[in-house]
Amino acid sequence: MEPFLRRRLAFLSFFWDKIWPAGGEPDHGTPGSLDPNTDPVPTLPAEPCSPFPQLFLALYDFTARCGGELSVRRGDRLCALEEGGGYIFARRLSGQPSAGLVPITHVAKASPETLSDQPWYFSGVSRTQAQQLLLSPPNEPGAFLIRPSESSLGGYSLSVRAQAKVCHYRVSMAADGSLYLQKGRLFPGLEELLTYYKANWKLIQNPLLQPCMPQKAPRQDVWERPHSEFALGRKLGEGYFGEVWEGLWLGSLPVAIKVIKSANMKLTDLAKEIQTLKGLRHERLIRLHAVCSGGEPVYIVTELMRKGNLQAFLGTPEGRALRLPPLLGFACQVAEGMSYLEEQRVVHRDLAARNVLVDDGLACKVADFGLARLLKDDIYSPSSSSKIPVKWTAPEAANYRVFSQKSDVWSFGVLLHEVFTYGQCPYEGMTNHETLQQIMRGYRLPRPAACPAEVYVLMLECWRSSPEERPSFATLREKLHAIHRCHP
């Protein structure tokens, strides 16, 4: 065995001399040992394939089959001195130090990130940054860290706080992969090196008391995403707040993207309103996915409802073919969503069929809750534009801007009228001014032909002049469900 290995792997003569010193007995083989006549022996190139030594990590257990191989266990750290022929010649850094050949299929290169689970290792930190960290609260004298060396590729440095200054020590690597601060004191790894100098700190004149505490990074809002993650596709519509587009998130997830019109919005209040939206969770509310508010235009990204808004859907052939049960189903679902907002003390301010979205299976969800509060005062005014939703707005809100859950109840009554007229515009033929005048004189929308009498009674209750006399959404929800059960 010895002559064969010395002849085939002559460049490892220093290693063979350790195994078979001069005058030693030759190895005539042991039971189960590698037979050079029957088993292939790796042939390593004369020149290394890459700069060595390199760090490897054992992926699987391997049991040596001859004296030239190295037994390793999964997780062992290895320092590879040579590589080739499907093997590495490596020194084990953990456990009992020894060296030998290990199949390359059983190991993987270990980058410095392998140390990232250690509290004292700071990847990507420069010498200057290490000083800033160690001298910043809550760190005190004795705080230390290991970082990649700036002057030695693949090497490390030890930085230690000593009162009001920071001392830096180069961690050198010996030819066999051992690490040291001082020649003559070799360690198989960084952990062993630190353990030694914690106990013998006087050798470097600075105690190693505790790992450096990283400064807390600013808390990142997981909802906030860059514009680059979203691609606009088909334009779905346009409203008071901006345009609505069908789009893709990260190239795969279909979403609805509301592009906010900054000219009409009080963007200074947008962050606060979005915080409210993030905390609302109900199956009858449109689900918020993400926000892009780091620059203009602002995106509000929500789930995509395939059939669009309820007002437009009711005017399609599919919508006009619906009979009483699904229409009552729409009313019940909207009442459920609004009852939840009522419990959360959130005022919608712009409840209408156009702000209810429909998906496959005729599931519907309330959208745009709370955004009307962000419209600039000169935009949200009954006299400013015929586009403003005065016909859906309670008189106290239209005249005096007094919004409440009860003004939402008024709007819900108008939404019910839309549902049972298959999306027709309420107060058709009247201007905003005429509508308000007629309402103040006591006029109320007539009962639609498709509307049950008991539902129309609820509409009239929603349109009571005194807000306090209007029903709650919880009451409306229960009454509508009872009516729905009578019309299965």
Curated annotation (Swiss-Prot):
Effect ascribed to mutating residue 380 to F: Significant reduction in phosphorylation
Residues given in the record as ATP binding sites: 236-244, 258
Effect the entry attributes to changing residue 223 to A:
Loss of kinase activity
Query: What is one process in the GO biological process aspect for this record?
Result: positive regulation of TORC1 signaling
- Catalyzed chemical reaction(s): L-tyrosyl-[protein] + ATP = O-phospho-L-tyrosyl-[protein] + ADP + H(+)
Which GO MF term does the entry hold, naming one? non-membrane spanning protein tyrosine kinase activity
Entry GO terms, CC: cytoplasm; cytosol; plasma membrane
Please describe the organ and tissue distribution of this protein's expression.
Answer: Highly expressed in most breast cancers (at protein level).
Task: For this UniProt record, give its keywords in alphabetical order, as a comma-separated list.
Answer: ATP-binding, Cytoplasm, Kinase, Nucleotide-binding, Phosphoprotein, SH2 domain, SH3 domain, Transferase, Tyrosine-protein kinase
Q: Which residues form the active site?
A: 350 (proton acceptor)
Q: Which Pfam families does this UniProt record tie to the protein?
A: PK_Tyr_Ser-Thr, SH2
Its EC number is 2.7.10.2
Per UniProt, residues of the SH2 domain are: 120-212
Intracellular or extracellular location(s): Cytoplasm
Impact of mutating residue 258 to M? Loss of kinase activity. Exhibits a diffused cytoplasmic localization. No effect on interaction with KHDRBS1 or VIM but abolishes tyrosine phosphorylation of both substrates
- PTM annotation (Phosphotyrosine): residues: 380
The residue ranges of the SH3 domain are: 51-112
Q: Which residues form the Protein kinase domain?
A: 230-488
Q: Known PANTHER family for this protein?
A: TYROSINE-PROTEIN KINASE
Family in the record: Belongs to the protein kinase superfamily. Tyr protein kinase family. SRC subfamily.
Function, as annotated, reads: Non-receptor tyrosine-protein kinase which phosphorylates DOK1 on tyrosine residues. Also phosphorylates KHDRBS1/SAM68 and VIM on tyrosine residues. Phosphorylation of KHDRBS1 is EGF-dependent. Phosphorylates OTUB1, promoting deubiquitination of RPTOR.
Its domain comment says:
The N-terminal region regulates its kinase activity.
What does the annotation say about its assembly with partners? Interacts (via the SH2 and SH3 domains) with DOK1. Interacts with KHDRBS1/SAM68 and VIM.
Output this protein's name. Tyrosine-protein kinase Srms
The species is: Homo sapiens
Q: Which gene encodes it?
A: SRMS
